[in-house]
Amino acid sequence: MQYVFTALGLLSRLSLFVVVTPILAGWFFVWMVIATAFAWFAWLIVIIILSDVPMGEALWHWFVFWPMTITGWIIGASDWSNRTGIKLWGRKPGDSHGSARFATRKERAAFEGSDGLLIGRDLDTGKLLRYDGPAHLLTLAPTRAGKGVGTVIPNLLLAERSVLVIDPKGENAKIAGEARKRFGAVHILDPFGVTGMPASAYNPLGRLDAESPDLGEDAASLAEALVMDPPGQVSEAHWNEEAKALLAGLIMFAVAHEDADRKTLATVREYLTLPPEKFRTLLELMQDSIAAGGLIARAANRFLGKSDREAASVMSSAQRHTHFLDSPRIVAATARSDFQFSALRHELTSIFLVLPPNRLDAYSRWLRLLVAQALQDIARDAEASQTGAARLKQPALFLLDEFAALGRLEAVERAMGLMAGYGLQLWPILQDMSQLKDLYGARANTFVANAGVLQTFGVNDFETAKWLSQMIGRETTGYQTESHKPGDAPSTSYNVTARDLMTPDEIMQIDPSVQLLRVQGKPVIIARKLRYFADREFDGLYPPPDAKLAKPSSER
């Protein structure tokens, strides 16, 4: 019996199709005739009013006739479509459920200027896309996705501005070091001789002034960079804070009372590894010091006021965070200063911080120190009203590759929120959004909110893809449904709904040569990634692949 009802249903729908289709077609024809008649009537009135020549004999009559006739057809067809629900042509769904969309060709053309940082290449025209705004930038891309060849090196080769770049493998210095010399001075800080190129050094204590009222703040900033607070380890917070206080006091003492050649972090490490009785003597000397407005004496009193057990834990924490200073390579790299970070604002200067990936965990505090020092120096220089030196037109660029290796650094977080107007642009580069959230928690949004450009490619984890999908937004899309009831004409309806402009799985399936760019205040851009070794704009700016570089010395 079920098959009988199925057959009858099919026969009914077929009969309705055969009967209803001519009716709908006739309805459409009648509607078109009526609309055309109204158009002709309007045309006739125009001819009668404006012309004394018989209808159709003047050429301009026809220039009036056809537009009116076509307009009548369009009106009639549209009305018929609305009444029947049958879609005749592309119908715009509106934006009631979302207005997200991709950037148009005209909107992308705004980024094809000759100035600014390179962010990609237009898919249609092949022209370079640049960002010339003052805001910071942020890149999310997994390892081996092309961050170096597509983001870091292209900008190092062409950006005529001061640059500080974290260079984990030394490849950026090898490839772009010579090219940067045409802009200005180049300093490569390479404690482990990865690049085989002449290495510079920087002493974080070198610019501290014992007579400055800012000595306490400067020492605290260095201590903050030395002590890494692992995310989620609340139990370590007290010991780390006390270790910072002790380190700040020891740094101030070294600056105020040591000879010039001993005003280094190596001396601070030497203090921390003294035998207990000698360290006690050092603390007593600090108590007698009147330098730094009494801050040195206060630091000693604070430590001596602790119980033996608490003091031992604080001492252990301070020693742990300065263990990297036992390396002769790091000692040599921090023994003198070949430049000042404030020069980044006044002279075209390039600084490469080279640390091999296999040493990032052990020596990341060295990177933290230098980045924190650079940010503080630039901020101080910008605030110094007495300086007469002219500032460079373009802001200094901080390309912070392997950003997560720095750990949570308050100086960077403050810079993302406050220092865009100080002649500084930060460009943190991370593997995924999880890295940023692990380090900064809810305050990770500070980085996203202050990024004028968000660049993403090669996304292969669902959480980052989901976050991107939500951030890109939703579009309003339309769809048509048909329903059939026995004995009734088919019913067609047009509906609208919301859809992610790009779903997480679509983001994860993007071609490896393509990237997403979200520029502040603009629709999302789909662009091609750059490849310095294959793109003609970079020809002749870097050494050929077979160029022989000096091998790093085992003694450096």
Language-model features: locations:
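P-loop NTPase motor domains
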Residues: 4-7, 11-23, 27-36, 124, ...
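Basic- and hydrophobic-enriched, low-structure N-terminal and domain-boundary segments
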Residues: 2-145, 149-152, 195, 204-205, ...
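Conserved ATP-driven motor cores of ASCE-family P-loop NTPases powering translocation/secretion/packaging/pilus
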Residues: 416-516
